[in-house]
Amino acid sequence: MYKGIVQLVIGLMMIVTLLVGYLPIPEYLVELTCVSNMLGGVLLTIDGILSICRKKNLSSNLYRAVCVCILTVFFICLGSLTGFFHFNFKGAFFFLHVINPIAFVGCYLLFCNDAERRIVSAANFITPVLMLVYLLFDYIRCQFTGKFVYGFAEPDVLTFP
């Protein structure tokens, strides 16, 4: 019961901070910050409800896939502290870039039972798929718009011959 309540509260916090941060600027809804926080919030909310009502849990494979995305956001934000690029840490974006990733990974570490999972398993190959799909989406979007979502690289450099 405690686990489900914590998951539900953190999941709803992630969704609410996402809505507060991104509703005024809907053109940025394609950012990985938005996508990973929304997926993480929905995953925690659904898992919390299932845990409270039916005493069931979602697969830890889903948690790992979202962890890859949300930790990518977190580590890029840590890299922004070097001063090479700028990220918005004001208001809800502080939660989206710092607090929510830490809370989501904390939920994964505390509530997902991966102790009996083998290190080499076919299910582990699913983990990076979500991140790879997002990168493919960003590349295809760049082909249509002429710019990447975050603009870390010039489109001319990353084209196929």
Protein language model regions, located:
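Non-cytosolic membrane-interface motifs at loop->transmembrane helix junctions
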Residues: 27-34, 59, 85-97, 118-123, ...
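Membrane-interface transmembrane-helix boundary segments in multi-pass integral membrane proteins
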Residues: 144-161
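N-terminal membrane topogenic signal
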Residues: 1-10
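Small-polar-interrupted transmembrane alpha-helices in polytopic inner-membrane proteins
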Residues: 11-18, 63-79
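Juxtamembrane "helix-exit" motif on the non-cytosolic side of transmembrane helices
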Residues: 18-26, 53, 77-87, 140-144
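Membrane-helix exit/interface motif
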Residues: 46-54, 73-87, 106-113
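Membrane-interface helix-boundary motifs at transmembrane edges
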Residues: 52-62, 112-122
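Hydrophobic cores of alpha-helical transmembrane segments in multi-pass inner/ER membrane proteins
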Residues: 10, 36-49, 99-111
